[in-house]
Amino acid sequence: MTQVATKTSKQKLKIPKRFEVLLLNDDYTSMDFVVEVLERFFHKEFLAAEAIMLKIHIDGEAVCGTYSFDVAQTKVSQVIEYSRKNEQPLMPVLREVNL
């Protein structure tokens, strides 16, 4: 009988990078449309969506959520597509979160 020595090594797991999805203010997109997008794509309750919309309006941008890269990229694509279908220039962007 042959014995085989096995060596196990512990790999350090890297914490996956996280990305914020932000919406940017513009002079054309209606506040109601922004609230609708926040409810539809970011699953925000009406009052939370309204608060985020006001932050976008006042500060020029606001974070809608923090996700893995794939999920964040999907949300950005969905919002861009939905905005274009509705002839709105609403612009979502990704920003990497530094942990």
Region annotations inferred by a language model:
Residues 1-99:
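Terminal domain-initiation and capping elements
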